[in-house]
């Protein structure tokens, strides 16, 4: 089950290893958490039903992570230690299935440690790095290993004030900041077949846009070269301020580009990732407001 109120990127409770030989999972103990009444209005006669909710300053639930081995039928519990109320977030497996990476956040939510555990013994292997902020630290995404180099991974972080991508090795050394600027990476989509480029969407401004700053009203698809740290625009209609969503083919050669805006009905195109060229229009939705006089702000 999902834990920690589904915060910090947590949306599930089961995590298969890359080859499917083991299953990591959350276990949550709420016995120490006070009940909080919630009115159930689904029934004809509404009634109060208690839920477990940790109020500020009171006991929170305790979470542990287990690893079930399919071949032996045995479960190993990761030795995450104390304090037991810390948040265990963004679980990820190493490509060789020997280690598990967890972003551990303290109850105050101002310090995060990226920790590596042995999936075989449950022992803590290393604290790779720590992120702190006097206001708030919010890990949202697990480590993403490079497909052609299992000794390196990409980490998403807001440590400079904007959500950007960083390249680390498995010792915890930051090799480079892959993206930077006063804009945010909104989605990491995947790698090309050779693992040389990463496809993302972001609010990065560009020369075709009337914006010279990052804005959530203008999200485009980009190809990020991991070696050079350079981005190239993928979405051919980027001059139109709109929000793009990409779905990249397994080969990484093509992508489905879907976008719309308050004044642009849904448009879906097949594009070539080599140069962002539009190959074919798949859908151009009709304008539902055509013929109406719309109010202006």
Where are the regions that the model predicts?
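Signature of short aromatic-glycine-proline-rich micro-motifs recurring in repeat-based ectodomains
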Residues: 2-18, 90-92, 139-151
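Extended catalytic-interface subdomain
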Residues: 8-37, 49-73
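Beta-strand C-termini and the immediately following turn/loop, strongest in propeller blades
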Residues: 12-15, 24-30, 55-59, 95, ...
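Residue-level detector of Asp-centered blade-edge/turn motifs that repeat once per structural unit
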Residues: 18-19, 95-96, 147-149, 192-195, ...
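Non-catalytic accessory segments flanking enzyme active sites
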Residues: 22-28, 33-37, 62-64, 78, ...
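Carboxylate/His-rich catalytic cores and anion/metal-binding grooves
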Residues: 39-53, 58-62, 107-123
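Short loop/turn segments that connect beta-strands within beta-propeller blades
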Residues: 69-73, 119-121, 169-173, 225-229, ...
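Polyanionic (Asp/Glu-rich) segments that form extended negatively charged tracts
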Residues: 126, 164-180
């Amino acid at each position: 089950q999902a834990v920690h109120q589904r915060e910090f990127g947590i949306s599930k409770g089961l995590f298969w290893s890359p080859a499917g030989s083991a299953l990591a999972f959350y276990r949550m103990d709420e016995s120490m958490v006070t009940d909080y009444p919630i009115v159930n209005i689904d029934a004809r006669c509404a009634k109060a039903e208690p839920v477990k909710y940790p109020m500020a300053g009171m006991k929170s639930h305790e979470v542990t992570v287990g690893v079930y081995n399919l071949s032996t039928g045995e479960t190993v519990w990761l030795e995450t230690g104390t304090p037991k109320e810390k948040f265990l977030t963004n679980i990820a497996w190493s490509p060789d299935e020997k280690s598990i990476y967890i972003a551990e956040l303290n109850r105050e939510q101002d310090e995060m440690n990226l920790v590596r555990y042995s999936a075989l013994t449950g022992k803590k292997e290393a604290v790779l790095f720590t992120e702190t902020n006097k206001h708030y630290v919010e890990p949202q995404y697990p480590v993403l290993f490079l497909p052609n180099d299992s000794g390196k991974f990409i980490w998403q972080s807001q440590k400079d004030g904007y959500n950007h991508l960083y390249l680390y090795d498995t010792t915890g050394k930051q090799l480079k900041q892959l993206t930077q600027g006063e804009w945010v990476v909104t989605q990491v989509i995947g790698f090309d077949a050779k693992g040389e480029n990463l496809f993302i969407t972001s609010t990065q401004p560009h020369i075709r846009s009337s914006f010279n700053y990052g804005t959530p009203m203008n999200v485009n698809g980009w190809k990020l070269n991991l070696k050079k740290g350079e981005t190239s625009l993928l979405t051919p209609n980027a001059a139109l301020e709109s929000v793009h969503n990409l779905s990249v083919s397994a080969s990484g050669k093509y992508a489905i580009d879907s976008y719309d805006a308050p004044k642009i009905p849904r448009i879906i195109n097949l594009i070539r990732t080599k140069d962002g060229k539009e190959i074919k229009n798949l859908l151009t939705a009709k304008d539902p407001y055509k013929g109406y006089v719309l109010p202006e702000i």
